[in-house]
Amino acid sequence: MASSSLHFFFFLTLLLPFTFTTATRDTCATAAPDGSDDLSIIPINAKCSPFAPTHVSASVIDTVLHMASSDSHRLTYLSSLVAGKPKPTSVPVASGNQLHIGNYVVRAKLGTPPQLMFMVLDTSNDAVWLPCSGCSGCSNASTSFNTNSSSTYSTVSCSTAQCTQARGLTCPSSSPQPSVCSFNQSYGGDSSFSASLVQDTLTLAPDVIPNFSFGCINSASGNSLPPQGLMGLGRGPMSLVSQTTSLYSGVFSYCLPSFRSFYFSGSLKLGLLGQPKSIRYTPLLRNPRRPSLYYVNLTGVSVGSVQVPVDPVYLTFDANSGAGTIIDSGTVITRFAQPVYEAIRDEFRKQVNVSSFSTLGAFDTCFSADNENVAPKITLHMTSLDLKLPMENTLIHSSAGTLTCLSMAGIRQNANAVLNVIANLQQQNLRILFDVPNSRIGIAPEPCN
């Protein structure tokens, strides 16, 4: 049985993907520094991560541009989810050589005795999977889950009802012996893996969740797999949210820290207790073709006091085409359908009113930082909710501090040109609350540090 009540929530410490030079306490300790039941989360590139590169630039814009270089893979992946009926091989991922995806990771423990795993949080995925011992093509055998070391590990048979919930099944049509539930999937736009459906004990802070189901990756290829797997927070039956409904009531929220500090941290809360009381909600829309994605009804965008003219076809939710707007934790820069972005950009440039603009990486509207004080705020209008983005979520500065850029972009033409994505850069220092049973999402300002 789980060790906490239905209303238990936990705090997950989130950090930024930067190099740490000093520390006032042991930030890599498994337990929370204050002795609470918080479950620690660390940045995938930080010193506490086993995947941290030797050298990481501390420049905010360099870090953002580096992470945003993976957005094209992410958008291709999201596009594949909503473009028509999903194919058997059109979901999760694995890679072997290079990390291209995942900005925040959570420390979770699996097995008996518990093995510490660092798993990427993904709101647009409904699966939980990780590389297991003996995986061919996985990035590092030392970071894999050792199934032989867990006394509570077990496989799931093809004959079980749960096996039918996995996409890309490869179970034999007939077999004299019960076969292990196996499947093939893809993720991130350029990666694929084969896995077995298994069960083991999942430990989240003090909560012990027996018989938790997840994909145990046996072989992988491509460039998009988080080295120790993924923790899907979508609405599908195999996600963390769905498998822990009796414990956390299908409610979770997160507050992502700003990219402007070495030490800022944020939190992820699971369950009803501790969620903000003063928060405004907008309905969640459900796409039956891909129910895991968290769609919202974006009705318009204002730049300053001007609501920009946009053809409703680029904002209207359409389950058949996948059109609409989603909130996603894995994309770095908010992307709009090109006509929507151009309308926002042109009005923004008009109000900034400088003689010329330059381009920097993914950003095409950069100007002298001396004119930053005239930059207008951008408001996203949703049903029953107007989200006025803080300036730190709208502008980003060059390494030298001489340029300021509008930190949004259009969707490239060969991606799904009708899917708008509200990304993590624009979600920072906001509490984003997902209330799945009541089909709503709440947003409120909150300092996430």
Swiss-Prot record:
InterPro entries: Aspartic_peptidase_A1, PEPTIDASE_A1, Peptidase_aspartic_dom_sf, TAXi_C, TAXi_N. Pfam families: TAXi_C, TAXi_N. SUPFAM superfamilies: Acid proteases. The keyword Manganese does not apply. Its main location: secreted. It comes from the Eukaryota. One of its GO terms (cellular component) is apoplast. Residues 1-23 form the signal peptide. GO terms for biological process: proteolysis; regulation of programmed cell death; systemic acquired resistance. Keywords: Apoplast, Aspartyl protease, Disulfide bond, Glycoprotein, Hydrolase, Nucleotide-binding, Protease, Secreted, Signal. The active site is at residues 122, 328. It is an enzyme of class 3 (hydrolase). Belongs to the peptidase A1 family. This is Aspartyl protease AED3. It comes from Arabidopsis thaliana (Mouse-ear cress). The gene is AED3.
